[in-house]
Amino acid sequence: MNDTAVKVDKIFRPFTVIRERQRSYPVDVDALAADLDISVVRKDWPDNVSGAIGKDGRGYFIIVNSNHPKVHQRFTLAHEIAHYVLHRDQIGKDGIKDTWMYRSKISDPDERAANKLAAEILMPADLLGRAAVENGLQLNERNLDALATALDVSTTALAIRLGVPA
């Protein structure tokens, strides 16, 4: 493979892998991380720290706060995967640590981009529609809880994704 092909593969491979994992819901983000050769560790951390992504001699790794609710852990993992996809060049030895109030060493626009991609990973439009149809639901605020349960996401994350009040 020549240099250009390697660069193109580095850019597009993660998106191809994401789409493969989005064939069914809820999206298996742990398997997605494994497919991308990212190790995942759940750790007992303070409540104000959600997760982190870093790189060491063995490759990329993500740490997720095991004290948070499962749906929050799933979003955090998707968010850190999004950092891998979008900001690999910024992930150094110190990694990127995400807290509720502070995002370390990375700009707010980059955090918003990671949040947006995390939502797209967990709740792509085609899966939203399919989950609604298969569960006999309309995509509206009255059905947020049922649809969030089907997708294994928080009601708040789903409401933001749909642009409706939570």
Language model: regions and residue ranges:
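Active-site hotspot residues in diverse enzymes, especially metal/ion-binding acidic/histidine motifs
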Residues: M1-A166
